[in-house]
């Protein structure tokens, strides 16, 4: 079986986890609320703009203030809190998976 097939199997296994199901459910709640969905998408755009490309320290600081303000406004919304919690749990699962892959590769280099 090829590497692409194994990667597909890994993705399917990740999608079969409780963490993914909870994240998907939390995202669906946000997606049903047009206004909230728009605010979350705007927050993601601001994050991407901050972390992509080369910008001056002053511009980065300005964007960070904007991002912090947007996050602060959303942080009081229960649906957003749930989305962030489930996203964090799923990211922990991904990090653990990547750590295990890395350890296996490192062991193979010895």
Residue ranges and their predicted role:
Residues 1-110:
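Terminal, compositionally biased segments used for targeting/anchoring and flexible tails
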């Amino acid at each position: 079986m090829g590497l692409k097939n194994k990667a597909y199997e890994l993705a399917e296994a990740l999608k079969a986890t409780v963490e993914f199901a909870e994240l998907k459910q939390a995202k669906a709640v946000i997606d049903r609320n047009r206004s909230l969905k728009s605010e979350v998408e705007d927050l993601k755009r601001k994050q991407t703009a901050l972390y992509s490309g080369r910008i001056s320290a002053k511009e980065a600081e300005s964007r960070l203030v904007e991002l912090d303000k947007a996050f602060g406004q959303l942080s009081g919304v229960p649906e957003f809190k749930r989305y962030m919690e489930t996203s964090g749990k799923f990211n922990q699962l991904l990090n653990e998976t990547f750590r295990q892959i890395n350890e296996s590769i490192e062991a193979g280099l010895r």
